[in-house]
């Protein structure tokens, strides 16, 4: 009996040692955890287009080649939480939502920053748009005017995004009153909440209700009248525009590629991003620089 027990102990010890050696050589512990946003997310739509993960066939039909087993997160905050808690994770978020719980990678040697976004050196950049119909209520039109005013653009810049009009006129208070409903992108929501807070102090006769969902839902809400203003962190498509809305760009934002703070990788190429997200590269072993 003792002999059998000794043999079993030796086997378990060997298995444990083999697992440890495998991990140290880039085995299962080195496998990349790929984190993506959900379908309908403007951040996902812009990211897959700009990095080549989305491809078109000869007829112009688009295919999203994000790997099927990617972990899907339905908001920026959830992506941050997942990446900060997994040393092998990779994800992508709005540059303006970056915090010190994760590490933003350089892309092609360029760090995401206000300067590199404005210069065009950082390549993964997209607009923040709002979707509105003609004939907005006085209150909704006044809020839009505030967003595009010098006061609104300054709030956008202070929040870490790129203002689209450096010479915007000052906000002119009028007699607008009522309620404005704004819905859509979780990436746009944080800065929209700051804009709404400041606007309601400037015009105390208007209340602004900001509802977070995703870009596609926000655009649909604006089309069907569920909301006055839809938020989108991507370009609004021709098909969407044909349904009675117009697109107004309120800011520019980059998409930051993020990893865990303990990850040794600091820089990544566009080709490597595509390879990771389409599944042709599955470990970090040959990525460390």
What are these regions (language model features)?
Residues 2-4, 19, 182:
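Intrinsically disordered/low-complexity terminal segments and short unstructured peptides
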Residues 25-289:
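Exported/periplasmic ABC-transporter solute-binding proteins
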Residues 12-19:
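Alpha-helical transmembrane segments
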Residues 2-12:
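Bacterial N-terminal signal peptides that target proteins for export
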Residues 20-24:
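C-terminal motif of bacterial Sec signal peptides marking the signal peptidase cleavage site
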């Amino acid at each position: 009996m003792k002999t059998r027990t000794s043999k079993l102990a030796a086997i378990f010890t060997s298995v444990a040692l083999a697992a440890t050696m495998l991990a140290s050589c880039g085995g299962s512990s080195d496998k990349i955890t790929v984190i993506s946003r959900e379908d309908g997310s403007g951040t996902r739509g812009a990211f897959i287009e700009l990095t080549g993960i989305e491809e078109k066939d000869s007829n112009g039909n688009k295919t999203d080649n994000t790997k099927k087993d990617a972990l899907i997160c339905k908001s920026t905050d959830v992506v941050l939480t997942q990446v900060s808690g997994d040393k092998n994770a990779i994800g992508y978020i709005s540059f303006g939502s970056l915090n010190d719980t994760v590490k933003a990678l350089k892309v092609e040697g360029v760090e995401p920053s206000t300067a590199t976004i404005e210069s065009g050196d950082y390549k993964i950049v997209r607009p923040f748009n709002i979707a509105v119909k003609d004939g907005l209520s006085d209150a909704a039109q006044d809020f839009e005017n505030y967003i595009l005013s010098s006061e609104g653009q300054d709030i956008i810049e202070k929040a870490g995004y790129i203002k689209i009009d450096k010479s915007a006129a000052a906000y002119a208070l009028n007699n607008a009153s009522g309620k404005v409903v704004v819905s859509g992108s979780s990436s746009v929501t944080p800065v929209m909440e700051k804009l709404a807070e400041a606007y309601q102090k400037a015009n105390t006769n208007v209340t602004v209700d900001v509802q977070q969902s995703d870009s596609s839902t926000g655009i649909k809400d604006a089309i069907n009248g569920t909301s006055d203003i839809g938020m989108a962190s991507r370009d609004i498509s021709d098909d969407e525009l044909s349904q009675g809305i117009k697109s107004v760009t309120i800011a520019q934002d980059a998409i930051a590629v993020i990893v865990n703070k303990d990850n040794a990788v600091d820089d990544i190429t566009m080709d490597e991003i595509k390879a990771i997200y389409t599944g042709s590269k599955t470990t970090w072993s040959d990525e460390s620089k």
